[in-house]
Amino acid sequence: MSRFLGSIFKKSRRYGISLLENNKEFTKGKKRTTAPGQHGARRVKPSDYQLHLYEKQKVRYMYGLNERQFKHLYSIASKKQGVTGVILLQMIESRLDNLVFRAGFARTRAQARQFVNHGHFTVDGHKANIPSMVIKVGSVIEMKPSLQTSPQVKDAVEAMTVSPWLTKTDFKVTFNRLPERKEFAKDINEALIVEYYNRR
């Protein structure tokens, strides 16, 4: 786990944002503006391609998606009516692991993913153990009793807030609506992601 966190801390510094969305990566001191590594202080203007790639990677790392998963969601989003970048973010936000995180059942998306993998949740009364599962609006996600007394869950419930597009009652949460663009992280520029894939 420590190696994973170390990697996330370095990536957060590289991209200049908290990928964990809690600023934990920067609590030990002043937030650095340089990239990690011996030559991190060298300011080199990134190329146009690098800007687009960095934006894609930033969102990937923030939500914990691998390249295949991210590309698959983009492919679906690009075929839908509407603004492709916003639809992509809405689909990512609709993943089961992310909704467990947004509901405040876990401190991080990695922890939420672990809970889902271990079969601790149901969706509309049915077993759900696939973190990447895209949940439909109106669905109800419920935590099984086996996890409800966990100290990790208690810690998360006390520390985290529930996103406004969800309604939570005890260990049950309803996915009421898709989040609006203004509710996503302000540091995300989804237009660069769309341009990245359009150029490939």
UniProtKB/Swiss-Prot annotation:
Explain the purpose of this protein. One of the primary rRNA binding proteins, it binds directly to 16S rRNA where it nucleates assembly of the body of the 30S subunit.
Q: Could you give a single Gene Ontology term from the biological process aspect? A: ribosomal small subunit biogenesis
Q: Could you tell me which residue ranges the S4 RNA-binding domain spans?
A: 94-157
GO CC list: small ribosomal subunit
Subunit details for this protein?
Part of the 30S ribosomal subunit. Contacts protein S5. The interaction surface between S4 and S5 is involved in control of translational fidelity.
Tell me which family the UniProt entry assigns to this protein.
Belongs to the universal ribosomal protein uS4 family.
Q: What is this protein called?
A: Small ribosomal subunit protein uS4
Task: Kindly name one Pfam family recorded for this protein.
Answer: Ribosomal_S4
Instruction: Tell me the gene name.
Output: rpsD
Q: Which domain of life is it from?
A: Bacteria
Q: Which SMART domains match?
A: Ribosomal_S4, S4
The entry lists its GO molecular-function terms as: rRNA binding; structural constituent of ribosome
Record keywords, A-Z: Ribonucleoprotein, Ribosomal protein, RNA-binding, rRNA-binding
